[in-house]
Amino acid sequence: MSSPKNEMYYSLLEWFKTLNLNAPHSDAESLADGVALAQALNQFAPESFTDGWLSKIKPGAVGSNWRLRMSNLKKVAQSVYDYYSEVLNYSLGDFAKPDVQRIAEKCDLGELERLLQLVLGCAVNCTNKQSYITEIMSLEEELQANIMRALQELESTRNASSSPEAGGVVSSLSRSSLSGILDGKALQEERDAMAQKCFETEKKMLLLIDEKTNLQQELQKLQQEVSRMEHSSTAIGDDGVSLGPVQTGSVRYNDLRRQLDLLKEELLQSEGAREDLKLKAHQQETDLLHMQIRIDELMKSSAEVTTLKDEVDVLRESNDKLKICEAQLDTYKKKLEDYNDLKKQVRILEERSADYVQQNAQFEEDAKRYANTKGQVELFKKEIQDLHAKLDNESSKNVKLEFDNKNLESKNLALQRAKDSLLKERDNLREVVDELKCGQLSSSSALAGNTVSTELQPLATVDKLQRLEAENKALREGQGGQTALAQLLDEANKRNEHLREQLKTANERILSLSHATQSDDPIFKENEFGKQIKQLMELNEQKTLQLEEAVTQSSTMQCKVTQLETNLAAREQEILAYDAKYRKCVEKAKEVIKSIDPRIASALDASVLEKNAEVVEEEPKPKMTVMEEQLMTSAFYRLGVNAQRDAIDSKLAILMGSGQTFLARQRQSAPRKSLSAMKSK
């Protein structure tokens, strides 16, 4: 028995079992994978839950990883919510969304009940809802009540944003259609039962009519026999014995009378049964007429239901159009707001564009100012590129020379080893030659000492001694040569083994190098490429660090340069003011000198034009006039201005040259030449 808590779940499960599905759907474990639910949704609304969507549901998730089941259930729940919102125009904001994780992991009946409730709503609102509603009405009354309660809960939890008119019409339609179908089905069953009863009563009536005719025939036969018996004087029985005349009080008369009474009683009973059957048939005919009238009324109500359904469809379409119009109105409102925002943004952008035009004009003026420096920068760039190319060539030449030097060193070492081996062989040969020389001297001295004694000895002994000495000499010479040859052979063998080892190592190295160069092993190549990439990344990091340092230095120096340029501009303005004052003073001095003595004025004009207002050294005079003092003060003032300008230029050169790279120093403008240098030129 199902518990009251999960009564609705079991009712929904019984309804779900009535569906014709390929996947198993008899219990909670079989529904936990979502395959049966997806197939049911595809059966309800194939235009929304398409076969492509059904193919995304993985069928082999039962009893395996619960995460696969959870992914299937997520897809099913999301598609159901989309169907309610997009197709049915339902908003399920207040309806508790089923927890698919609990269904997939623990087969929670409460969460599965919510999911089945949503699937039931899809079934009773699809295009073929009439067939599914009839299947629901074929269930037990308790199950029907639970299913209706589930539909009412689903309807009551709709969000207030959805139109209440459409929802009420849909719910009334579902209830009216359910009640109409229920009443029609009950009346159909009653009509079938009454028709069956009428058929049975007709059969009974026919049987009774047959019995009545048979009884009437038997009665006629009996009456004929009675009349025959009455007219006949004697009768013979079955055994051939005469029964005697039929008279009152006789045995035969009594028997016939008894049989006649029995037949009358049976006839009365059959007539009573016939009357009863007639009454029943009449009652059933009246009931049948009432049923027919009720069926006609139900047909009229079903026609009214269909008209109401058509009206509901029209209202639903109008509601959909109203929603579409409201959505379009909202979109137009949003577009209007966006249009106002865009207007504001356009105004802001126009203001910014005006500012940018002014900035662009300023930048063009600055570009015209710095056009001269660009040529110098390009020249310096070209020189730097040439120097880099020369540096690359020199580095490649240096690498080649280092490689040649290593080869020559290896050749030198090989020659040195060969030289050492040859020197050793020479020393060994010298020792052998010295030994041979010593052996020859000893043999010659022995022969000279024995010549005197051989003359006194007999010939046989002399011959024997000579023969023995010759053999001894030959043996000594052979032994000495063999030792020398053995030493030479050993040295040659050692040298040969050493050369073989060197050849072996060289061949192994050649094979390893050739294998390394011609190897197609991707792991080796990946290692080599990895090493090269690491080296390049390290170089790149170093270059980026150097570049960042250079950028920071350039930014700081740019700030300093801008400050110094502002200071320099202020100084130049001051110098121009001082120059104007100086010229005024000089003109006043000239006017004063002209007023005093025109000859001195002409001489002073010539000296000022030739040497730019420098003080002309003259012979010492006994007394200094006022004009001379004024000229000296003006010259001293001019000298101070020039000295100050030179000091500023030297400070600028020091600041611009310190802490900068070669390119940064070349980019800076050269300091102005002093007035004294210009004058000297």
UniProtKB/Swiss-Prot annotation:
Q: Which Pfam families match?
A: HOOK, HOOK_N
Task: Indicate the segments annotated as coiled coil, or none if absent.
Answer: 135-439, 482-584
Report if keyword Coiled coil is assigned.
Answer: yes
Annotated compartments: Cytoplasm, Cytoskeleton; Endosome; Synapse
Entry annotated with the keyword Coiled coil:
yes
* GO CC, any one term: endosome
Instruction: Please give the positions of the paired cysteines in each disulfide bond.
Output: none
Q: Which Gene3D superfamilies would you find in this protein's record?
A: Calponin-like domain
Q: What GO terms are given for molecular function?
A: dynein light intermediate chain binding; microtubule binding; small GTPase binding
Give GO terms for biological process: cytoplasmic microtubule organization; cytoskeleton-dependent intracellular transport; determination of adult lifespan; endocytosis
Concerning InterPro entries, the annotation shows:
CH_dom, CH_dom_sf, Hook_C, HOOK_N
What is the similarity comment for this entry? Belongs to the hook family.
Kindly provide the name given to this protein in its UniProt entry. Answer: Protein hook
Q: What is the lineage of its organism?
A: Eukaryota, Metazoa, Ecdysozoa, Arthropoda, Hexapoda
Gene of this entry: hook
